[in-house]
Every structure is written in structure tokens, then in C-alpha cells.
């Protein structure tokens, strides 16, 4: 408010900026997946890849605290985008996470307020849902099977838990290295996939979205076992 001639007058509303697409990247433990996820040529629609820092080095062994720190840092990045940089709420935002980073990204995709133009992509989410899947009898992710809450929460993610369209990708039993037991735990043998399958995604976000489509999706979820 300001005054003119003794009369209070409302200040004109600040016009939001039209900002280009951005891709917030949360890599896995010891930066797994970060190299390709941060390549601009693999980002969708010319989005600018921005790494969200969080504790994920070898010495960072408190996974619960690590995920919480990542969630806080990602929310800060979103605040800076919409408030500090005054970007329009229609600015295209991709939130992409792999493994430990998928737990971070998925938590924010479940809780971020509505009304924004966000697309999620999760590689090897340990809480991956078993429903809405292209794989009959899909068992879902490892952390969803733990008897106590794991980092990122307890149980498999709710079928309709995401607030924004989210593509979740997991290497299944027919992939070259077998099932990735982090996101597809059908048996104890699938745990071997942490070494033979888990590190070997393309991390080509643009190609994955071209292959499987961007949202909207039913229940904001497109759940894909590869191949």
C-alpha cells in the first residue's frame, strides 16, 4: 500500500516471470546416475538440469537423515524458483531422482502443494508401488517391504499418493542384469540385482518420457517395469 493525496492506494501486483523449463536432479548413493542425469542433451524439452545437493557420500550412513536433508533442499530450490526468482507457477519443472534420490523426489512429489506444472521421473524407487503396473503380479520396491519405516517413509507408496504426474521406472526380471531388487523385490534372489541391474539405467530422462509419455496419468502414476 502507498498513499497519494491522502488516499491509500494498493501497489500494483508483481508480475511473475516467464522462466524456461528446469530439471531438479537428485542422484543416488555416491552420486550414482548423476553423470547422465546432469547432461543437458538428455534433459526433456531443453530443461536446465540442476543438481540438488544432499548427503549421499560413502561416509553418510544415516539414510533417514539424508533423505530428510534432501527433501528440505529440494523444497528450498522450489521456493527459490517460485518466490525468489518469481517464476510463473506454470514454469515447467521436472523432478528426477534415482535410488536414494528417488526417495527424496518421491516424498516431495507426494506433498508439494497443487497448482504447479510439475512432472516427476523416478528411477529405482525403493517405495515403488505395485499397482498401475505393466507387469502382472508386480511386487513393488524393497523399502516398501520393510517391517519398520525405511528412509522416505513406511510401506509401498499409495497408489494415488503423488500430487503430480510421476513416471516411475524399474529394471525387471527380463532386463540384461535381471530384476533391480531395490524397486522390484519378488524374491531374495532379486537382491543380487543391486549389483547387476541397479546401476545400469540409461538415465535419459527425455527418452523415457518420449517412450512412456508425460502426464496427466490415471492416479498421477505411470508405473513401468523395463523391459
Which residues are covered by each model-predicted region?
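Secretory targeting and sorting signals
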Residues: 1-11
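Small-side-chain structural scaffolding
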Residues: 8-10, 70, 102-105, 124-126
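Surface cap/lid and interfacial helix-loop subdomains adjacent to catalytic sites
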Residues: 14-61, 65-88, 111-227
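Gly/Ala-rich beta-loop-alpha elbow adjacent to hydrolase catalytic centers
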Residues: 93-109
Amino acid at each position: 500500500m502507498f498513499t497519494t493525496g491522502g488516499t491509500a492506494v494498493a501497489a500494483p501486483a508483481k508480475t511473475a516471470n516467464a522462466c524456461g523449463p528446469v530439471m531438479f536432479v537428485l542422484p543416488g548413493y555416491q552420486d550414482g546416475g548423476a553423470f547422465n542425469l546432469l547432461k543437458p542433451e538428455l534433459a526433456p524439452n531443453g530443461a536446465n538440469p540442476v543438481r540438488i545437493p544432499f548427503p549421499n557420500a560413502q561416509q553418510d550412513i544415516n539414510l533417514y537423515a539424508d533423505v530428510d536433508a534432501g527433501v528440505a533442499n529440494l523444497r528450498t530450490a522450489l521456493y527459490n524458483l517460485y518466490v525468489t526468482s518469481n517464476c510463473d507457477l506454470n514454469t515447467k519443472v521436472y523432478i528426477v531422482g534415482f535410488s536414494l534420490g528417488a526417495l527424496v523426489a518421491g516424498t516431495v512429489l507426494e506433498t508439494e502443494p497443487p497448482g504447479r506444472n510439475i512432472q516427476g521421473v523416478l528411477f529405482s524407487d525403493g517405495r515403488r508401488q505395485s499397482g498401475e503396473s505393466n507387469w502382472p503380479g508386480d511386487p513393488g520396491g524393497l523399502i516398501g517391504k520393510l517391517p519398520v519405516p525405511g528412509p522416505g517413509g513406511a510401506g509401498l507408496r499409495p497408489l494415488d499418493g503423488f500430487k503430480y504426474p510421476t513416471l516411475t521406472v524399474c529394471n525387471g526380471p527380463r532386463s540384461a542384469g535381471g530384476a533391480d531388487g531395490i524397486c522390484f523385490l519378488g524374491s531374495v534372489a532379486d537382491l543380487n540385482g543391486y549389483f547387476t541391474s541397479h546401476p545400469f539405467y540409461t538415465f535419459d530422462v527425455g527418452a523415457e518420457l518420449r517412450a512412456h509419455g508425460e502426464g496427466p496419468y490415471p492416479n498421477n502414476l505411470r508405473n513401468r517395469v523395463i523391459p
